[in-house]
């Protein structure tokens, strides 16, 4: 993965598939990107979720904050329909799913930690959970 130039697909191929989804990362690979950037925040149950915004409104069928929700609730939301019917039923992935995808496809991944509007307690949990995830 040391070839140059390094082209990063921001939130995956976000102009071709719904951002921050496995579909977007797969599409990035399909069009030749070897690296992608993705955003990580924390859900109410401590799950590390891949999402850019601090609400569900723009990119899912849900609304409001996810800081009080568990991943089982978030996983039920459609994160692709807003983009096109082709991606209906695409889901918000967990960070571990995205890292596993990058590893399996031998792609580089740039993880961006979101500001965590859920407050200091959740922000600390986010950093701790990421450290454990990345160390494991």
What are these regions (language model features)?
Residues 1-136:
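Phosphate-group recognition and catalysis centered on beta-loop-alpha active-site segments
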């Amino acid at each position: 993965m040391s070839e140059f130039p390094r082209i990063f697909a921001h939130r995956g191929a976000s102009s071709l598939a719904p951002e921050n989804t496995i579909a977007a990362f797969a599409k990035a690979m399909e069009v030749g990107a070897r690296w992608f950037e993705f955003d990580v925040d924390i859900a109410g149950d401590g799950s590390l979720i891949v999402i850019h915004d601090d609400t569900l409104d723009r990119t899912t069928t849900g609304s409001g904050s996810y800081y009080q929700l568990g991943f089982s609730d978030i996983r039920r939301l459609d994160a692709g329909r807003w983009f096109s019917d082709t991606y209906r039923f695409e889901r918000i992935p967990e960070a571990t799913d995205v890292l596993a995808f990058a590893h399996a496809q031998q792609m580089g991944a740039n993880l961006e930690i979101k500001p965590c509007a859920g407050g200091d307690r959740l922000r600390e949990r986010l950093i701790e959970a990421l450290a454990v995830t990345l160390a494991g």
